[in-house]
Curated annotation (Swiss-Prot):
It comes from Bos taurus (Bovine). Keywords: Calcium, Calcium channel, Calcium transport, Cell membrane, Disulfide bond, Glycoprotein, Ion channel, Ion transport, Membrane, Transmembrane, Transmembrane helix, Transport, Voltage-gated channel. This is Voltage-dependent calcium channel gamma-1 subunit. Disulfide bonds join 57-81. Residues 30-109, 157-180 are extracellular. InterPro entries: PMP22/EMP/MP20/Claudin, VDCC_g1su, VDCC_gsu. It comes from the Eukaryota. The chain crosses the membrane at residues 11-29, 110-130, 136-156, 181-205. GO terms for biological process: establishment of localization in cell; regulation of calcium ion transmembrane transport via high voltage-gated calcium channel; sarcoplasmic reticulum calcium ion transport. N-glycosylated. Belongs to the PMP-22/EMP/MP20 family. CACNG subfamily. Glycans are attached at residues 43, 80. It is found in: Cell membrane, Sarcolemma. Pfam families: Claudin_2.
Amino acid sequence: MSQTKTLKVRVALLCILVGIVLALVAVVTDHWAVLSPHVEHHNSTCEAAHFGLWRICTKRIFVGDKERSCGPITLPGEKNCSYFRHFNPGESSEIFEVTTQKEYSISAAAIAIFSLGFIIVGTLCALLSFRKKRDYLLRPASMFYIFAGLCLSVSAEVMRQSVQRMVDSEHTAWIAHSLAWSFICACVAAALLLVGGLALLLLALPRMPRDPWESCMDAEPEH
């Protein structure tokens, strides 16, 4: 592999590395979405919430005279967090009482796990490719990174639809929502994994001959 090509491969791997870090941050944090209830009484407290793939946190926030909504979530208040019990039927947070909503949440978490699995396998292939004459391992590594980006983008879209469906439901007290920084990290990570994986795949593929005679001319003469 030439020095120019090696430099391009390193740039692609750096892009993928940033995507991996953002993907891990998105999966382990709980700021995918922020939910706000309807404010009926001023000079009282309201309960806002933010959640991720595994945990939901509610916070009691004081509402002033001029406030029309509950929040922002960064205001000080009494905080209470609980983990989702995705795989235990009949045990879920009160906010996820609707069966369809719980299915959405389980799907997003499961797809995110697949994404992390693809990242781990792709990273192993990339590390093994650094050994001499093992550049061919960059091809499966790039494919695994592309699959990870696709899974993460699907997980983000499922979560977005999940939140929208919950807010639109008649069985919930939440009337407003906003996608938070963990969701943005997931979207950026998916884009970096897709772009970096595709670039790495193109760099790892063998060079096609410019004309039909090139491969014959480059062949070693028979003795």
